[in-house]
């Protein structure tokens, strides 16, 4: 349903700062040791701000799909299908290009694909903050997402946890985590406590036989370290 979609989209965005920390695996940037934590977050903060990062107003309780559509339509297309070549550059917005007719499904899918926000809405919700990680951690990330989003009790718990999170909180959280990692405060509380709570919610949302898949990430959280930290120390996870 629309309500379910918007609920999960908002919760996914609220989770992004913590997921970025839990999955941080970039100890090196451009051939040099990193200068701070969450290098991936920093990189995306310096890409096209019109189509990356946080969807405008998505953390506002009044946000709806019309506003999401307006966000897409009011942004420059960059690439559009054309007859002369497969793709042509355009500095017009999607809304201007398609003002005279209804977009086809393929055109809508292309328009949505030209956005690279931290969470992206397609025919599914794409939760994007994780770094590339070794396979056991990728599996753990999948288990984490399943435990958080596929159990009604998990969604209820996250509703309570993130009810008051807004845009400024989100941006402040990213800055705090880049500077201080697990020592940071996020959304008014120690991020380490938030990560513990997130892991517990996810574990409770998984079947008994699935909970073991979560352990690689759960272990990092319990130790207050990231894969990037361990790489800097030349330690094995």
Q: Model-derived features: where do they sit?
A:
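Beta-strand-rich recognition/accessory modules
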Residues: 110, 126-128
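C-terminal amphipathic alpha-helical interaction region
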Residues: 202-237
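Short, charged low-complexity intrinsically disordered segments located at boundaries
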Residues: 39-51, 172-180, 225-236
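Loop-rich catalytic cores of soluble enzymes, especially ATP-dependent carboxylate-amine ligases
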Residues: 1-120
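Substrate-recognition/cap regions that form aromatic- and gly/pro-loop-enriched pockets
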Residues: 128-214
């Amino acid at each position: 349903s629309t309500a379910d979609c918007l609920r999960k989209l908002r919760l996914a965005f609220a989770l992004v700062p913590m997921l970025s920390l839990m999955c941080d695996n970039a100890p090196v940037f451009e051939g040099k040791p990193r200068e701070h934590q969450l290098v991936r977050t920093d990189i995306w903060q310096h890409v096209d701000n019109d189509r990356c990062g946080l969807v405008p107003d998505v953390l506002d309780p009044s946000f709806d799909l019309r506003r999401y559509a307006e966000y897409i339509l009011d942004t420059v297309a960059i690439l559009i299908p054309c007859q002369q070549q497969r793709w042509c550059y355009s500095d017009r917005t999607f809304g201007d290009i398609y003002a005279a007719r209804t977009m086809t499904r393929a055109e809508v899918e292309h328009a949505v694909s030209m956005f690279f926000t931290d969470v992206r809405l397609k025919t599914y919700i794409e939760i994007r903050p994780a770094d590339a990680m070794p396979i056991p951690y990728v599996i753990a990330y999948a288990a984490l997402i399943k435990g958080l989003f596929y159990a009604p009790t998990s969604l209820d718990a996250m509703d309570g946890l993130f009810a008051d999170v807004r845009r400024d909180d989100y941006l402040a959280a990213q800055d705090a985590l880049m500077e201080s990692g697990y020592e940071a405060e996020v959304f008014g509380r120690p991020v380490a406590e938030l990560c513990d709570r997130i892991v517990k919610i996810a574990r409770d949302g998984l079947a008994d036989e699935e909970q073991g898949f979560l352990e690689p990430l759960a272990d990092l959280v319990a130790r207050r370290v990231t894969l990037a930290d361990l790489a800097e120390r030349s330690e094995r996870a």
